[in-house]
């Protein structure tokens, strides 16, 4: 007897799958407010990109790629005298374009369609934090493009994207004043609200306020600040900034080692 190929021939009975997902909850009071999640960084991961970097911070995974410099869109612009250090005048400075995308499988909850308002806001924050560190005057009439892809959102996604993007720019050989290191913070609610460094996704969802700090560690200059929510008095926000800057300084050696390892791999590959 011929079978009916138009029907789904599944089993007559089914059983619900067992859930073995890791429990991200922490017992109240056991969380060290200054702890950083384990970090793994690798530069030069993509062979087809001018520069690339992959970063893991706990459950957060970000992949960044850099392309360019290439001629900026909009045609030729008029010339002018060169500035100090051989840089182009302000009117001819290069441009830094940033794109932030979230993979469909990045989080448990369904997100807005790609290219939505949230992704555009994060891309703009990425651009504003990276621009102070890049010597755009050395790339007249050109544009550099940075693409960040969030593979898994385990918390502090913007901070991880900032760090990975700066690492990718350095891997591409782009002239920079300094690297940019990002750190996220969240204000845990309760009778005695406490700022938590490098929060997880669940900690961000429960937080009364959030803050992302971007630091150029060698120059000791803040490249960007982005806060939201109700963080209380000014002293509370100042404490959060101080905690975030300390976290950025602690992450900086990890990026240095990643760039050194990438340079050694390139040197070994270039040898006959």
Swiss-Prot record:
<dbReference type="GO" id="GO:0003723">
    <property type="term" value="F:RNA binding"/>
</dbReference>
<feature type="region of interest" description="Disordered">
    <location>
        <begin position="1"/>
        <end position="36"/>
    </location>
</feature>
<dbReference type="InterPro" id="IPR027408">
    <property type="entry name" value="PNPase/RNase_PH_dom_sf"/>
</dbReference>
<dbReference type="GO" id="GO:0006396">
    <property type="term" value="P:RNA processing"/>
</dbReference>
<dbReference type="GO" id="GO:0006401">
    <property type="term" value="P:RNA catabolic process"/>
</dbReference>
<dbReference type="GO" id="GO:0045830">
    <property type="term" value="P:positive regulation of isotype switching"/>
</dbReference>
<dbReference type="GO" id="GO:0005654">
    <property type="term" value="C:nucleoplasm"/>
</dbReference>
<dbReference type="GO" id="GO:0045006">
    <property type="term" value="P:DNA deamination"/>
</dbReference>
<comment type="function">
    <text>Non-catalytic component of the RNA exosome complex which has 3'-&gt;5' exoribonuclease activity and participates in a multitude of cellular RNA processing and degradation events. In the nucleus, the RNA exosome complex is involved in proper maturation of stable RNA species such as rRNA, snRNA and snoRNA, in the elimination of RNA processing by-products and non-coding 'pervasive' transcripts, such as antisense RNA species and promoter-upstream transcripts (PROMPTs), and of mRNAs with processing defects, thereby limiting or excluding their export to the cytoplasm.</text>
</comment>
<dbReference type="GO" id="GO:0006364">
    <property type="term" value="P:rRNA processing"/>
</dbReference>
<dbReference type="GO" id="GO:0034475">
    <property type="term" value="P:U4 snRNA 3'-end processing"/>
</dbReference>
<keyword id="KW-0694">RNA-binding</keyword>
<protein>
    <recommendedName>
        <fullName>Exosome complex component MTR3</fullName>
    </recommendedName>
</protein>
<keyword id="KW-0539">Nucleus</keyword>
<keyword id="KW-0963">Cytoplasm</keyword>
<dbReference type="GO" id="GO:0005730">
    <property type="term" value="C:nucleolus"/>
</dbReference>
<dbReference type="GO" id="GO:0005634">
    <property type="term" value="C:nucleus"/>
</dbReference>
<dbReference type="GO" id="GO:0016075">
    <property type="term" value="P:rRNA catabolic process"/>
</dbReference>
<dbReference type="Pfam" id="PF01138">
    <property type="entry name" value="RNase_PH"/>
</dbReference>
<dbReference type="InterPro" id="IPR036345">
    <property type="entry name" value="ExoRNase_PH_dom2_sf"/>
</dbReference>
<dbReference type="GO" id="GO:0005829">
    <property type="term" value="C:cytosol"/>
</dbReference>
<dbReference type="GO" id="GO:0071028">
    <property type="term" value="P:nuclear mRNA surveillance"/>
</dbReference>
<dbReference type="InterPro" id="IPR001247">
    <property type="entry name" value="ExoRNase_PH_dom1"/>
</dbReference>
<comment type="subunit">
    <text>Component of the RNA exosome core complex (Exo-9), composed of EXOSC1, EXOSC2, EXOSC3, EXOSC4, EXOSC5, EXOSC6, EXOSC7, EXOSC8 and EXOSC9; within the complex interacts with EXOSC1, EXOSC7 and EXOSC8. The catalytically inactive Exo-9 may associate with the catalytic subunit EXOSC10/RRP6. Exo-9 may associate with DIS3 to form the nucleolar exosome complex, or DIS3L to form the cytoplasmic exosome complex. Exo-9 is formed by a hexameric base ring consisting of the heterodimers EXOSC4-EXOSC9, EXOSC5-EXOSC8 and EXOSC6-EXOSC7, and a cap ring consisting of EXOSC1, EXOSC2 and EXOSC3.</text>
</comment>
<dbReference type="GO" id="GO:0101019">
    <property type="term" value="C:nucleolar exosome (RNase complex)"/>
</dbReference>
<dbReference type="GO" id="GO:0045190">
    <property type="term" value="P:isotype switching"/>
</dbReference>
<dbReference type="InterPro" id="IPR050080">
    <property type="entry name" value="RNase_PH"/>
</dbReference>
<dbReference type="GO" id="GO:0000177">
    <property type="term" value="C:cytoplasmic exosome (RNase complex)"/>
</dbReference>
<dbReference type="GO" id="GO:0000178">
    <property type="term" value="C:exosome (RNase complex)"/>
</dbReference>
<comment type="similarity">
    <text>Belongs to the RNase PH family.</text>
</comment>
<dbReference type="GO" id="GO:0000176">
    <property type="term" value="C:nuclear exosome (RNase complex)"/>
</dbReference>
<keyword id="KW-0271">Exosome</keyword>
<dbReference type="InterPro" id="IPR020568">
    <property type="entry name" value="Ribosomal_Su5_D2-typ_SF"/>
</dbReference>
<dbReference type="GO" id="GO:0071051">
    <property type="term" value="P:poly(A)-dependent snoRNA 3'-end processing"/>
</dbReference>
<keyword id="KW-0698">rRNA processing</keyword>
């Amino acid at each position: 007897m011929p079978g009916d190929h138009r029907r789904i021939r599944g089993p007559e009975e089914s059983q619900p799958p067992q859930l073995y997902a890791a429990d991200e909850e922490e017992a109240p009071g056991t969380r060290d407010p200054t702890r950083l999640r384990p970090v793994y960084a690798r530069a030069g991961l993509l062979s087809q990109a001018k520069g690339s970097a992959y970063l893991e911070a706990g459950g957060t995974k970000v992949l960044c790629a850099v392309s360019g410099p290439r001629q900026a869109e909009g045609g030729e612009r008029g010339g002018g005298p060169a500035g100090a250090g051989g840089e182009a005048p302000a009117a001819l400075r290069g441009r830094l374009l940033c794109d932030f995308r979230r993979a469909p499988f990045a989080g448990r909850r369904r997100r807005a369609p790609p290219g939505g308002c949230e992704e555009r806001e994060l891309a703009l924050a990425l651009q504003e934090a990276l621009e102070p560190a890049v010597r755009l005057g050395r790339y007249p009439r050109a544009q550099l493009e940075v693409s960040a892809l969030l593979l898994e959102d385990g918390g502090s996604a913007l901070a991880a994207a900032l760090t990975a993007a700066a690492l990718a720019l350095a891997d591409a050989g782009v002239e920079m004043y300094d690297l940019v290191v990002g750190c996220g913070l969240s204000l845990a609610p309760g009778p005695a609200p406490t700022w938590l460094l490098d929060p997880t996704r669940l900690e961000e969802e429960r937080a009364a306020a959030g803050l992302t700090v971007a630091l150029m560690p060698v120059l000791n200059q803040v490249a960007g600040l982005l806060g939201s929510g109700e963080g209380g008095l000014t002293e509370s926000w100042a404490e959060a900034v101080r905690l975030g800057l300390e976290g950025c300084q602690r992450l900086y050696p990890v990026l240095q080692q990643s760039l050194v390892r990438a340079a050694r791999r390139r040197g070994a590959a270039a040898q006959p």
